[in-house]
Amino acid sequence: MNPRRKSRLYLAIVVLIGVALTATLMLYALRSNIDLFYTPSEILQGKGENHEKPEVGQRLRIGGMVMPGSVKRDQKTLQVSFKVYDARGAIDVTYTGILPDLFREGQGVVAQGVLGEGNVVNAREVLAKHDEKYTPPEVADAMKENHKGPASAYATPQNEGAKS
């Protein structure tokens, strides 16, 4: 192999290694900023054909309806706990902070946070839904069934969606 070809080969190898390293670092950085959207039933029963459930400690967004009678506020702190339900399940959500003005029982919400032990979502942010007109299509599709399931069908959030 002549020296000119050899130097081009080395340059091509260095460029490929650089591109691979850059792509790996970008994917690693983006991975920590991705929050997947789940409904309560998808957290309890799994999502997709493989029924993949989120892991404890995973960042996620959960969307559903606030179960009537489930909102509990701590009088001494700003901590609030409530249940979010859909047609096939209910999940506990805890949040510390001031809730949006549109937050109320029976209203649609999206909570962003981390999944804790016992399928409890520790939310960092709670968004109250006011109109489905402004909802992304994949979220709107997942939320369509939420209006169908009666909140009284869920005794506890850990009942895996079983009806009483």
UniProtKB/Swiss-Prot annotation:
Periplasmic side: 30-164
Residue ranges, compositional bias (Polar residues): 155-164
Any Gene Ontology biological process: cytochrome complex assembly
Molecular function per GO: heme binding; metal ion binding
Residue intervals annotated with topology Cytoplasmic: 1-8
Disulphide bond pairs: none
Biased composition (Basic and acidic residues): 131-148
Membrane topology, from the record: Single-pass type II membrane protein
Transmembrane segments: 9-29
Residues noted as binding heme in the record, renumbered to the chain: 130, 134
Gene Ontology CC annotations of this record: plasma membrane
Main location: membrane
Chain positions covered by the region annotation Disordered: 131-164
Keywords associated with the record: Cell inner membrane, Cell membrane, Cytochrome c-type biogenesis, Heme, Iron, Membrane, Metal-binding, Signal-anchor, Transmembrane, Transmembrane helix
UniProt-annotated location(s): Cell inner membrane
Entry keyword annotation includes NADP: no
Keyword Cell membrane among UniProt keywords: yes
Family matches, as InterPro entries: CcmE (IPR004329), CcmE-like_sf (IPR036127), NA-bd_OB-fold (IPR012340)
Protein function: Heme chaperone required for the biogenesis of c-type cytochromes. Transiently binds heme delivered by CcmC and transfers the heme to apo-cytochromes in a process facilitated by CcmF and CcmH.
NCBIfam families on file: PRK13165.1, PRK13254.1-1, PRK13254.1-3, PRK13254.1-5
Family: Belongs to the CcmE/CycJ family.
This protein's name: Cytochrome c-type biogenesis protein CcmE
Record organism: Serratia proteamaculans (strain 568)
